[in-house]
């Protein structure tokens, strides 16, 4: 039987613990999920590290939402955040940088990789909006990254199966491809069988209603983007179990 690895995109310490309870091998801890994930706080990383005992902790290093073209100030911030993650005991970090032309930003990536020595490094879904994925794959391998998180440059990994399969063949064991975005208990087995990929990234979240008794629903904390303050999405152990069992059954 193939040895699969499962990473949960965790939006809180609560989600990290649910991932661990469900049998995940690793979590990617992120804040700012509506923006695609941003660097979590010192307190969140530290608490997750204290409470995770069997599940590895990776931390996204992304100073803001939006594109992956970073200013010198943002790069400086990322370097400090990598050092913070290291000091707090993270097992790995997750980042990715592009040039204005959609190429891998090699000078910035080299700087971040140097700062990440001793940590596992995942090049995140900046890969999915790069100009030339085949060329980028070779460059990321040369940089020394351990894995690439990708949906095959599509809205979901299921839609990206053709490119994921081609990239898995091209990689030929030189780097791990981590299939992510829209991976769930209904499609993980298909993605695995059609691509040959053995690592999967998913959120396994469910919507939880707030315990607030008093609610002022006329005010939104998200400005022009409406986010329901009286509902939140958290990973559940049962959905993690279901997703893992779907591929192992």
UniProtKB/Swiss-Prot annotation:
Belongs to the CutC family. It is found in: Cytoplasm. Pfam families: CutC. This is PF03932 family protein CutC. One of its GO terms (molecular function) is copper ion binding. InterPro entries: CutC-like, CutC-like_dom_sf. GO terms for cellular component: cytoplasm. Keywords: Cytoplasm.
